[in-house]
Amino acid sequence: MRVAIGQAGGPTSVINESLASFVSTFSDDDIYLVLNGYEGLATNQMKAMGEMQRETIERSRGEPGAVLGSGRYDFSPALQKQALAYLMERRIEALVFIGGNGTMSALHAVQHLAEEAGYPLKVIGIPKTVDNDIAGIDHAPGFGSAAKYVAQSARYSKMDLQAMRNFEQVRILETMGRNVGWLAQASGYGMTEEAGPDAIYVPEREYSLETILGDVRRAWKEKGYCLLVISEGVTINNQQTALSNSRGRTILGGVSKVIEEAVREKLELVSRAEQLGMNQRCYYPAVSKVDQQEAAAVGTYAAKLVQNGESGFMVGVHRHDTMNYKAELTRVPLQIVSDGGERLLPDTYIEERKAYNEWLEGIIDLPPVSTQTQAGSSSIL
């Protein structure tokens, strides 16, 4: 059986776990490696896997990045047809990609083109994302580790800010997440409302600049400093902030700078904007063991789907209940994932940090902070 597999979109700390687990169930003769994501698929950048490539992939289990190469690519309908032609030329029987919701939509499109051409191509998706915006599942591998990094960063940043409040009064941490707030909301994990961020802003809500300045003013008057966390996709005064546009994709970012400048100009407080940056998706010391295990499991499950002749599905991660976390892997039709769009953070998790934290606890592999060590309780000031 000839199987082509690739990685697409932004990497995660555990994306290589899924790849290594998938290829470990096949012989070298079965696997064709697609290099550089959908660009490689559209330009015939495929190579048969040999022992050297297998060893490299196996070593990549403990590394971030995407060992096959990934990246962004405007995979247009014309390029999808071109990619299918290359797959047919190489007599590829199954196409598997590890990626997010855009990747799943692309897989669904290629499957449809193959059906129209009468070519029996099996198509399977393996989920990954730090944003947790894939429809039809509870969460995707990659999110748990990113959430852990955000939670730790916010926790320690607030302790640092508390110590420096006579020099710096306001700090704004900006997270990834695109148009959903799952990752930003993780900044309050394991802490009481009082000890966590003074406010968390997510894209599922719209905010005015005056509302945000009011939150800053209240926190500063109460304790002399304020820590805000904001997702990159948040809209302020009906405007979203973008850094640039690349390969047909808007690159969000910079909203923390908007707030920093407003705080400095209108409240005359010393403020600092900090983007948590790419470490959210690649800081391997913060990897969640649960996330790592689930990334490997979805790769193995996807291999079984291919070997059983299944097609048109993404591997789904679901849970039995929130309080006693246990993951269950299922098949989710690519049609549902594609049609579902971006999975938003529910109102309950926005309004009740405790409810969100209970949902996150089984995934993040990070103990809550004891009440004795919460930010604010360790100061004698």
Swiss-Prot record:
Part of the sulfo-EMP2 pathway, a D-sulfoquinovose degradation pathway that produces sulfolactate (SL). Phosphorylates 6-deoxy-6-sulfo-D-fructose (SF) to 6-deoxy-6-sulfo-D-fructose 1-phosphate (SFP). PANTHER family: ATP-DEPENDENT 6-PHOSPHOFRUCTOKINASE 1 (PTHR45770). Belongs to the phosphofructokinase type A (PFKA) family. Transmembrane segments: none annotated. Mg(2+) binds at residue 101. Disulfide bonds: none annotated. It is an enzyme of class 2 (transferase). This is Sulfofructose kinase.
